[in-house]
Amino acid sequence: SDLANANAVKELVIAGLLISSRKVISGIEWAKTLQGQEGVAKLVEKGKSAFVGPEIKGKRLGVIGLGAIGILVANAAHSLGMEVYGYDPYLSVDAAWGLSRSIIHATSLDQIYANCDYITVHVPLTPDTKGMFNAAAFAAMPDGVRILNFSRADLVNIPDMKEALASGKVAAYVVDFPTEDILGVENVIAIPHLGASTPESEDNCAVMAADELIAFLEDGNIVNSVNFPTVEVPRTTERRICVLHKNVPNMLSQISGVVSATVNGKHELKALV
């Protein structure tokens, strides 16, 4: 669940923002080539100008998708001095409570594309989102935009991304899902799917799985299921009956009648979920 690894991913996204700007990785690789040479300190001072990069403070970040991870990223980036735009047409009321008031509410993807120097995406892969970062999207962005993808590789049209990188439209692409067709491309920072790779995240996942099993076995609540919507109903009686059925007219009333006849008046039927 995103709730278990949200902080781990958030931290790596913030790292991605920094390394997409400051050319730290390429600078480190260059420094390794100086091994065995004389006057390394002087060589470093002479060569470091090739790795100049902008600060993120004061820049504009667009966060697409304001779920558990997106909200943490937006708030953290704002704390670092960025002007943050958030876009999510499906933002829940509960999620909105956790979003800083300072986050600018974008009403469309075009608003994100037109205004932001950095864009990070946190949405599921669906037929609508597959390839959403394509030539048309890049054309709407400012030159030198930096894009971070910690969601799914297929959100990005790779041939279009390569062209955008080659032209300078996209200054850097940070992706947590390396694929053969993107490896080795200049200005691509491919991270080996490390978003949730922390001991804390693994512990959180284990605890959450246990808690969710207990919630189902003891109260019938369903949370974070991959193939069923969330069902959370406060317990008001000692026992409850939950009926999962297709939306057939009068189905619940028929079942209620059968249950009422079965209990034969020995127990009060207060609720049928």
Predicted segments with their positions:
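NAD(P)-dependent dehydrogenase/reductase Rossmann-like domain
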Residues: 181-186, 194-273
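Oxidoreductase and adenylate-handling cofactor-binding alpha/beta cores
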Residues: 10-29, 75-82, 207-221, 256, ...
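Short beta->alpha connector loops at strand-helix junctions that form conserved
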Residues: 1-4, 151, 193-195
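N-terminal Rossmann-fold NAD(P) dinucleotide-binding loop
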Residues: 70-71
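Rossmann-like adenosine-cofactor binding region
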Residues: 89-182, 197
